[in-house]
Amino acid sequence: MYSMQLASCVALTLVLLVNSAPTSSPAKETQQHLEQLLLDLQVLLRGIDNYKNLKLPMMLTFKFYLPKQATELKHLQCLENELGALQRVLDLTQSKSFHLEDAGNFISNIRVTVVKLKGSENKFECQFDDEPATVVEFLRRWIAICQSIISTMTQ
């Protein structure tokens, strides 16, 4: 009788310990989200900047805006602002000769990751460069920004 109660007590204690134990530090979690964002951006860039992409010249006519200075997580608001335009460009250029697999999923993943990193509030006002960028320049710049933030975190 007592052994059953003791076993239940031990099981409940273990459940409480497991559920209350932190899985990772906030800094580690932030770094993991940044690395996922970086990976998603790199996959999109590889899909677009591909020698088989016959639609690339058309894609380069669309212009995107980059932040003047992006060094912190709050600057990811500027990326989020341009995701709709990026999605439209990717949707327009889908064809039999060029199909970026799961472009919509990558954009959704990027959007979710950005919200996790910067928070859901949109109080930050982006200051954009005067010169617009092509889709390739846009993705390369955001890749560099993510790499810079990650390297700052690991120092």
From Swiss-Prot:
Residues 1-20 form the signal peptide. It is found in: Secreted. One of its GO terms (biological process) is negative regulation of B cell apoptotic process. Its main location: secreted. InterPro entries: 4_helix_cytokine-like_core, IL-2, IL-2_CS. Keywords: Adaptive immunity, Cytokine, Disulfide bond, Glycoprotein, Growth factor, Immunity, Secreted, Signal. Disulfide bonds join C78-C126. One of its GO terms (cellular component) is extracellular space. SMART domains: IL2 (SM00189). Cytokine produced by activated CD4-positive helper T-cells and to a lesser extend activated CD8-positive T-cells and natural killer (NK) cells that plays pivotal roles in the immune response and tolerance. Binds to a receptor complex composed of either the high-affinity trimeric IL-2R (IL2RA/CD25, IL2RB/CD122 and IL2RG/CD132) or the low-affinity dimeric IL-2R (IL2RB and IL2RG). Interaction with the receptor leads to oligomerization and conformation changes in the IL-2R subunits resulting in downstream signaling starting with phosphorylation of JAK1 and JAK3. This is Interleukin-2. The lineage of its organism: Eukaryota, Metazoa, Chordata, Craniata, Vertebrata.
